[in-house]
A protein has these predicted regions:
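Intrinsic-disorder-associated, low-complexity terminal segments enriched in Asp/Asn/His/Tyr and depleted
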Residues: 4-6, 21, 44-50
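Phosphate-handling catalytic cores of nucleic-acid transaction enzymes
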Residues: 27, 34-507
């Protein structure tokens, strides 16, 4: 399997450099145009060249027909080992819900159980862990809570090894939040912590609050596994925690997606999040739960939980899992692809898009590690053997499966960003439009063919209100920021999306 050396960015340039043509008086499309191009039926997942270097797939193409192609991209459950896949499929038929939520929740639970016992070495000195930050996005009744309950049933029912079980906490962020988490992580029996949120909007509001910066930095450190110092006097453990690990999982309704974005700008939170979005629920009659499959899921987690037995210290160092030569070749080509996309100066990447691309290789490593250990655990469960603590390697097939998952999450992230941006654009535009209408302002921009500097012309007594709205617009990064640098026009002299959006409706 050899990657093609195509270097095609034209479609992505179009998406990021052209302006929106939706006017204030027009109804928005039923679903925002999303950055995917091919239905799954037309995508050969087995050919790494198609998936790996097709930039239309990774970076998006505006679908002029208005159809939402992402509705045709389900979670690739074929990447799971056979019995685990059967558990996900039959459980979702029983629940009459899309498999997306349960599949994503299972990935997070596996990563939490593995915790800090194993790490994948992508390059010399570059280790990634199996923990994930994931958010299930859907309307009320779409099945977020049932999926969480099914994936976490072995934990809720205390069916894992009690001596080496990990913590599931519902604690909301407070002044002592960091202290509580790190104190739990420092305990000898703790492999990792799963921070579970049935509804994540409150959590995101707190960490994105200007007073919550410390909490957000703490979560970023716990995601990356960087050493953390505990110095507060009321904490039982004081000192340096070498490899703290935390996973994050919960649900968020579509109308609350705006809480994901910090008003001060993109800081990497969205790039660290993986989003599960439901597709069409399974058709046909519901079926009874299969106790054998449910027990298989328990055995899988027990097998993975036993990996913590061979770490054996209060602050265990992870055992490293290496890639074989085929996996290394694929990994290096994926790295080159994402580097080429990020470094192409002709592409006007927004800060959030840049964050997603920057974290793509890291997320690929995490998904690869999870699938590798999950497949190994299922083999051991079916053969009745103990999981091998040593000698596990990543093969080329597994990293390709992880790439399929990465693409699924990648597209979902762009979907979420598009919904946030579209809603924000619409809200700011209406506010500015109503302000100008109330104050008799007919022209607020001056331009020469959309190519010169855009600037507000103060024709009202309260110009500060207009300026404040512009500050809000720029803080959202709606086509005005590129790699953290403000610019008033995108490449080719075209106006930013928001500028044209209101310009066409205020003259």
């Amino acid at each position: 399997m050899i990657l093609n050396s195509n270097n095609e960015f034209e479609i992505f340039r179009e998406m990021h450099c052209k302006s929106s043509n939706h006017g204030l008086g027009e109804s928005p499309p039923p679903q925002p145009t999303l950055p995917a191009t091919l239905p799954v039926s037309e995508t050969n997942w087995g050919d790494f060249g198609d998936l790996g270097y097709n930039h239309d797939l990774w970076l998006g193409k505006v679908n002029v027909s208005g159809e939402n192609p992402m509705n045709h991209i389900p979670v690739p459950i074929d990447v799971f080992p056979e019995k685990t896949r059967e558990y996900i499929e039959k459980t979702c038929i029983q629940l009459r819900k899309s498999p997306d939520f349960l599949a994503v929740a299972c990935l997070v639970v596996v990563g939490t159980v593995v915790g800090k016992s194993r790490a994948l070495q992508l390059e010399e000195g570059y280790l990634v862990f199996a923990n994930l930050f994931a958010c299930l996005v859907g309307m009320s009744g779409s099945g977020k809570s049932p999926a969480l309950n099914k994936a976490l049933a072995p934990i809720f029912e205390n069916k894992l090894t009690p001596e080496y079980s990990y913590f599931v906490t519902h604690a909301l962020s407070t002044a002592i939040y960091k202290e509580m988490l790190l104190n739990s992580l420092s305990k000898k029996k703790s492999s990792s912590i799963l921070q579970l949120k049935d509804e994540m909007s409150g959590f995101f509001k707190i960490v994105n609050n200007k007073n919550g910066n410390e909490e957000k930095e703490n979560f970023f450190s716990l995601f990356d596994g960087t050493p953390v110092h505990i110095i507060r006097t009321s904490t039982e453990f004081r000192g340096k925690l070498e490899k703290p690990i935390i996973s994050l999982l919960g649900g968020l309704v579509n109308s609350s997606l705006h809480v994901l974005r910090d008003g001060s700008g993109e800081d990497g939170l969205i790039g660290r999040m993986l989003f599960g979005i439901p597709r069409t629920p399974p058709q046909g009659e519901s079926m009874e739960a299969d106790p054998e499959l449910a027990e298989h899921w328990v055995k899988i987690l027990k097998s993975l939980d036993s990996l913590t037995l061979d770490t054996g210290t209060k602050m265990p160092q992870p055992r490293r899992i290496m890639m074989d030569e085929n996996a290394k070749v694929i990994y290096r080509k994926v790295v080159r692809m994402f580097n080429a996309i990020r470094d192409d100066k002709s592409i006007a990447l927004g800060d959030s898009h840049y964050s997603i691309l920057s974290k793509a290789v890291n997320q690929l490593g995490r998904l690869t590690l999870i699938l590798t250990l999950l497949k190994h655990a299922e083999e051991c469960v079916l053969s009745g053997t103990l999981i091998e603590p040593l000698g596990i390697t990543v093969d080329g097939h597994t990293i390709l499966d992880a790439l399929k998952l990465l693409y699924y999450f990648h597209v979902n992230s762009f979907h979420v960003l598009h919904q946030i941006d579209y809603t924000s654009i619409q809200s700011c535009a209406r506010e500015l439009f109503n302000y100008c209408k109330t104050n008799g302002v007919k022209t607020i921009f001056k331009s020469a063919g959309y190519s010169s500097q855009f600037r507000p012309i103060s024709k009202c007594t309260n110009g500060d209100s207009v300026e404040k709205l512009f500050d809000t617009i720029e803080s959202l990064g709606l086509g005005i920021k590129t790699h953290g640098k403000s610019k008033t026009t995108t490449s080719g002299g075209r106006p930013p999306t928001f500028i044209k959006f209101i310009f066409d409706n205020l003259n």
